[in-house]
Amino acid sequence: MERTLTILKPDCVRKQLIGAVIDQIERAGFRVVAMKKIRLTQETAGEFYAVHRERPFYGELVEFMSSGPCVPIILEKENAVADFRTLIGATDPAQADAGTVRKLYADSKGENIVHGSDSEENAAIEAGFFFSAEEVVRSN
């Protein structure tokens, strides 16, 4: 069973869409194995997104991700990484397919509701950033 990490971003929390997005995720066959609500500091957000440090949007991304609470979640499903990226849609909601999370709920490329890991390797690294082994529930 493959795992991926998602983060319901501050805009998702602010718009009170946590339940709606999790419902869509679970209806797509994903199982939640770890979840918590946290508020990232600018330093922690900067560490998580360090791979983007040289990109022009880095400062804005760190500012946004530390602007309010977010909800990191570890999900489990066969082909979890690819299937989740399909479910959430393109980074820019204007280019996302109909019915995807971002098409339904996101306002802009910068505030696009949800993060999704881009590879199995990164999913494991990102999951470890937010969760200890003890916080992850083994599925049956």
Swiss-Prot record:
GO terms for biological process: CTP biosynthetic process; GTP biosynthetic process; UTP biosynthetic process. It comes from the Bacteria. It is found in: Cytoplasm. Keywords: ATP-binding, Cytoplasm, Kinase, Magnesium, Metal-binding, Nucleotide metabolism, Nucleotide-binding, Phosphoprotein, Transferase. Its cofactor is Mg(2+). Its EC number is 2.7.4.6. InterPro entries: NDK-like_dom, NDK-like_dom_sf, Nucleoside_diP_kinase, Nucleoside_diP_kinase_AS. It holds the Pfam family NDK. HAMAP family: NDP_kinase. NCBIfam families: PRK00668.1 (NF001908), PRK14541.1 (NF011113). This is Nucleoside diphosphate kinase. The lineage of its organism: Bacteria, Pseudomonadati, Chlorobiota, Chlorobiia, Chlorobiales. The gene is ndk.
